Amino acid sequence: LYEKEKAEAGLFMNEVALNKVVLACEEFAAYDDISEHLLYASFQERLLAFCEEYHTLSEEECRAYLEKNTTILEQELLPAYLALAENLTLLSPLCNKDYSGLCSYESGKEYYLALIKRNTGSYRSIQNIKEMLFADFEASYLNLISLVSTYPQLTETDCLYEFDNVFPLTDAEDILEQLKSSMIANFPPLLASPNVEVKKVSESLKDYCAPAFYLTVPMDDYEDNVIYLNDANSLEGLELYTTLAHEGFPGHLYQTVYFHNQNDTSVRNYNALLRNTLYFGGYTEGYALYVESLSYDYAISLCSDAGVTDARIICETLKNEWKMQISLYCLLDIAIHYDGATYEQVKTLLNKFGILEEESTEAIYQYLLEEPTTYLKYYLGYLEIENLKQISKGVWAEDYSDLAFHTFLLKTGPCNFKRLEDELLEGE
């Protein structure tokens, strides 16, 4: 009904997006043997693990739950996906034909600005946001040019790709332990060390999951934490290291546990519980990207101690490439949805940065079209935290330290960046 109302109002998705959704629904609902479907396999795996650990259900009860799940899948859930695909297909004549951004709709610019504020927690003007992104992109670009000019070996084809083969750590648990050691001096300690388990994504879920993710804990149980790695994506070396920094320490896992337990003594931390009901994506993802950036420096120390040749210049090169790519996508997001950039204009710009394949440029444009502000949530959030860091250096002067700033950021907890800046200045 919702998509039908959107279509009738002229706000329906474009044909490429529709075809992707319909295909995803059809593939999700398809099965030869229900026992091989991901929702059957995942439910069975978790139910059997529960029964084995807690012994609260009899074999007969477990079997009854499995049968009930099968009935729901076969008779209700999967047919609903097929019905959704069929009904969406009927709306295809109402697809958006011009493949343009939000600004092409009535009040689209205003909606996009509201979306930025909501998803990033930044209250800056669009012009100020552009200036921040341009300045950061230029700084990364100049750093990259300087590195390549000073160290011509970076232009050798295999130099950067072979770095993963000599990276000192390969095991996820070992990397998390090393990250915990690296962050000690600059981050406040947790009241209690949480249980952390690294799991592989179930075979049945590999095609539907991100390369890695932290499974956010229930609000009443933050002691047992899980990070999932997806074997379908070949994360290794530096990429695995920085990803685990983002998801684990000092990233999402650490930030979540710290905020939950900082006030937990004899009473519940109602502040943290309330924040669980609110959305502060710019803070949480911006913070995770901020510590991911820091982890490149941790990697330099790790590799240098292990005697890896050219560790510093390779890590710095990869870090600047990574930052350039995300800031470029943020600028394109604004160009498409606020300034009205067309596919041809976006393609021309991407070509200048070496992205030449039509399939790649189309995929980037389509993703930005379908997911406005997603990259901004991460990167503008990151830039806002870097800005707060600079403000704190001016406010605290000789009392500044990275530890003090990180403690302030983590204790204040998830909120918008205007509130964070006000808190910082009020504590002057």
Label each residue range with its predicted role.
Residues 1-428:
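N-terminal maturation segment of proteins
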